[in-house]
From Swiss-Prot:
Protein name, as recorded: Large ribosomal subunit protein bL25
Source organism of this protein record: Leptothrix cholodnii (strain ATCC 51168 / LMG 8142 / SP-6) (Leptothrix discophora (strain SP-6))
KW RNA-binding (keyword) present: yes
Family note: Belongs to the bacterial ribosomal protein bL25 family. CTC subfamily.
PANTHER family associated with the record: RIBOSOMAL PROTEIN L25/GLN-TRNA SYNTHETASE, ANTI-CODON-BINDING DOMAIN-CONTAINING PROTEIN (PTHR33284), RIBOSOMAL PROTEIN L25_GLN-TRNA SYNTHETASE, ANTI-CODON-BINDING DOMAIN-CONTAINING PROTEIN (PTHR33284:SF1)
Native organism taxonomy: Bacteria, Pseudomonadati, Pseudomonadota, Betaproteobacteria, Burkholderiales
BP-aspect Gene Ontology terms: translation
Pfam family, one: Ribosomal_L25p
Any one Gene Ontology cellular component term annotated for this protein: cytosolic large ribosomal subunit
């Protein structure tokens, strides 16, 4: 994916605030052989790009001052309650750069699995993304998780995933975490309330 950035001359809180009022987003690009560079981007173009999954988990081509650089999205700051991007960080990469990045999981063949088709169970997606470590040029936009082999009582773990040899899942000390697990469908028990008898009417008192 490609996007355009512009060099940012003025810095500081006041300058960033004025940029945002003008429909721009302040940011920075760092890493590689170049120096950290303050940049600005068009807010609307960036906001719509951020809606695309690939913008978060793939190598991007940034055009800056007539030059093209390969970068990855590193950090993103959003407004607490408004749909506004406040700041964005990018890291320069090349074919020798080894990076750690979270990538989304795409689950496939769930409906065709024995767990769903025959055992009438549900498959719970325990995680929706995984952090991986690999060379930047090998960074996948997503990881495919095949659920077709699951049956009742089974779970799918990180070690069960079919990944390229160059890709390593970062588990942060957790041993073979669960990615998806089969759970039975629990039918709610309908409780029928016993009828309540109305109390007998007492005899009314006559008028004196």
């Amino acid at each position: 994916m490609k996007f355009v950035a512009f060099a940012r001359e003025l810095q500081g809180t006041g300058a960033s605030r004025r940029l945002r009022h003008g429909g721009k987003v302040p940011g920075i690009v760092y890493g590689g052989s170049g120096k950290p560079t303050s940049i600005e981007l068009d807010h609307n173009a960036l906001y719509h790009a951020l809606k695309k999954e690939a913008f978060h988990s793939s190598i991007l081509e940034m055009e800056l001052a007539g030059q093209s650089e390969k970068v990855v999205l590193r950090a993103l700051q959003m407004h607490a309650f408004k749909q506004l991007v406040l700041h964005v960080d990018f890291q320069r990469v090349d074919e020798t750069t080894r990076i750690k990045k979270k990538v989304p999981l795409h689950f496939v063949n769930e409906a065709e699995s024995q767990a769903v088709k025959l055992d009438k169970c549900l498959i719970n997606h325990v995680v929706s993304e995984l952090e991986i470590e690999c060379l930047a040029e090998k960074l996948p936009e997503f990881l495919t998780v095949d659920l077709g082999g699951l049956s009742k009582g089974q779970s799918l773990h990180v070690d069960d995933l079919k990944l390229e040899a160059s890709i390593k899942v970062v588990t942060h000390g957790r041993k073979n975490p669960v990615v998806a697990t089969v759970v039975p469908i629990v039918e709610e028990e309908v409780i029928v309330a016993a009828p309540v008898e109305a109390p007998a009417k007492g005899k009314g008192k006559g008028k004196k």
